[in-house]
C-alpha cells in the first residue's frame, strides 16, 4: 500500500470522535458524527460525479484536461470510501488483502465461486 494511503488512513482514525475528532473543526469528523448514511450519500454523489467525468472525458476525446477531471473525481471517490472503511473500523490494507486474494482469479471464476458459496449456504 502506498504511503499516501497509509497516512490518510491514520488521519481518518485521528478524526474519529473517540480519538478527539472535532466536528466543528474537521470535515472528516463531521462525516463520522453524521454517521454512515451521510457517508454513503457522499459516496453515491462522488460515484455519480466520477461516472459523469468519465463520460465527459470520452466525449471530449480524452483530452489532458478531461483525464485530469476523471482522476480528480476518482480521488474524491476513493477518499470517501476510505472514510467509510474507517467508520467501520476497516483499513485500506483490508481492501488490498481482498484484491490480493482475487489476484489471478478471473472475474467469471469469482462470480461462479460466489454463486456456489451462496447455493451451499442456502442448502445448509
From Swiss-Prot:
EC nos: 3.6.1.31
Catalytic activity: 1-(5-phospho-beta-D-ribosyl)-ATP + H2O = 1-(5-phospho-beta-D-ribosyl)-5'-AMP + diphosphate + H(+)
Broad class of the protein's primary localization: cytoplasm
One GO MF term attached to the UniProt entry: phosphoribosyl-ATP diphosphatase activity
GO CC annotations on file: cytoplasm
Involved pathway(s): Amino-acid biosynthesis; L-histidine biosynthesis; L-histidine from 5-phospho-alpha-D-ribose 1-diphosphate: step 2/9
A biological process from GO: L-histidine biosynthetic process
Matching InterPro entries: HisE, PRib-ATP_PPHydrolase-like
UniProt keyword terms in alphabetical order: Amino-acid biosynthesis, ATP-binding, Cytoplasm, Histidine biosynthesis, Hydrolase, Nucleotide-binding
Places the protein is found: Cytoplasm
One Pfam family matching this protein: PRA-PH
Disulfide feature: none
Family: Belongs to the PRA-PH family.
UniProt protein name: Phosphoribosyl-ATP pyrophosphatase
Amino acid at each position: 500500500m502506498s504511503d499516501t494511503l497509509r497516512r490518510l488512513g491514520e488521519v481518518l482514525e485521528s478524526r474519529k470522535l473517540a480519538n478527539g475528532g472535532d466536528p466543528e473543526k474537521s470535515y472528516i469528523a463531521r462525516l463520522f458524527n453524521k454517521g454512515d448514511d451521510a457517508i454513503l450519500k457522499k459516496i453515491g454523489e462522488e460515484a455519480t460525479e466520477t461516472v459523469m467525468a468519465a463520460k465527459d472525458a470520452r466525449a471530449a476525446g480524452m483530452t489532458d484536461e478531461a483525464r485530469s477531471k476523471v482522476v480528480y473525481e476518482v480521488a474524491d471517490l476513493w477518499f470517501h470510501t476510505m472514510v467509510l472503511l474507517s467508520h467501520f473500523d476497516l483499513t485500506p490494507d483490508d481492501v488490498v488483502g481482498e484484491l490480493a486474494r482475487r489476484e489471478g482469479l478471473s472475474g467469471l471464476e469469482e462470480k461462479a465461486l460466489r454463486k456456489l458459496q451462496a447455493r451451499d449456504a442456502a442448502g445448509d
